């Protein structure tokens, strides 16, 4: 019997709640090693805290590092600047939000969005321990981002979009909240185009970040359909046969004015009124 989208979401939520409780000393880990989002033949390699530079890990609370479940380091490729507003989708224990908050400085803001209460509580404590105050953690779904349109300069995410059961909605929401010309910098698991959906599922489970991964061409087409340009998907490391950690980058199509092009105004209507 096929698993429904809601059932998959609950499996993901339960898995990450368990991981948060383990970091907080309240339960067992997910069984995949140090914070790894792993299953199948991945054995945890290419996931977790080891993907961050030692100097980054050293400046973070231990719990933020231990709670890292990602497959990359999106803050390293997002090219954040002081004063920017950045949003992390599926922010988990807050590692990328804390790093982003320091990059954008006191005049910038870093948002973290997560659906799991246990992860949100852990992230808020980690932010307090890190001494960052320009952060806000929001509860919600990445398919329904609780922020206004055109309110964010940069969206990042770390091994989370593959877990969504409605990736088109996620990409559309990213396009909605980004300002024109805003940037996307994501680490995710991406499949080679040669693999069918069934072959991806053979390599690992949905909650293990494998079965739900998009193929490279699917990711590129999805972003272009959502109004992005300068789309690139670059494989960085193998996590299973035909499956890779990848850096996904794109820019929300700027308005004509932002591109330096003339804005054509509608012609005045003839008549007396």
Where are the regions that the model predicts?
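Conserved alpha-helix/loop element of class I SAM-dependent methyltransferases that forms part
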Residues: 30, 36, 41-85, 96-99, ...
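Short conserved loop adjoining the S-adenosyl-L-methionine
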Residues: 144-149, 165
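Hydrophobic beta-strand segment of the Class I
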Residues: 86, 155-156
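Core SAM-dependent methyltransferase catalytic element
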Residues: 226-229, 235-272
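Class I SAM-dependent methyltransferase SAM/SAH-binding core
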Residues: 66, 71-74, 81-144, 169
């Amino acid at each position: 019997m096929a698993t429904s989208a809601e059932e998959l979401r609950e499996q993901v939520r339960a898995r990450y709640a368990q991981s948060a409780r383990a970091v907080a000393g309240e339960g067992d880990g997910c069984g995949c090693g140090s914070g790894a989002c792993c299953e199948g033949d991945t054995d945890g390699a290419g996931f977790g805290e080891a993907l961050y530079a030692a100097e980054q890990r050293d400046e973070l609370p231990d719990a933020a590092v231990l709670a890292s479940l990602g497959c990359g380091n999106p803050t390293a490729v997002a090219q954040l600047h002081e004063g920017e507003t950045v949003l992390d989708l599926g922010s988990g224990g807050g590692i990328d939000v804390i790093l982003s908050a320091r990059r954008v400085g006191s005049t910038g803001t870093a948002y973290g969005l997560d659906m799991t209460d246990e992860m949100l509580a852990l992230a808020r404590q980690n932010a307090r321990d890190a001494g960052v105050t320009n952060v806000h953690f929001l509860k919600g779904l990445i398919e329904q981002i609780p922020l206004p349109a055109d309110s964010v300069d940069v969206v990042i995410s770390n091994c989370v979009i593959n877990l969504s059961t409605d990736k088109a909605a996620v990409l559309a929401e990213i396009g909605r909240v980004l300002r024109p010309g805003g940037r996307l910098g994501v680490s995710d698991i991406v499949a080679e185009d040669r693999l069918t959906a069934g072959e991806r599922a053979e390599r690992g489970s949905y909650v293990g970040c494998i079965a739900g991964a998009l193929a490279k061409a699917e990711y590129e087409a999805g972003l272009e359909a959502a109004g992005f340009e300068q789309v690139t998907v670059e494989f960085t490391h193998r996590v299973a046969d035909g499956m890779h950690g990848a850096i996904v980058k794109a820019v929300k199509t700027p308005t004509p004015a932002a591109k330096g092009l003339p804005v054509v105004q509608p012609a005045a209507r003839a008549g007396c009124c």
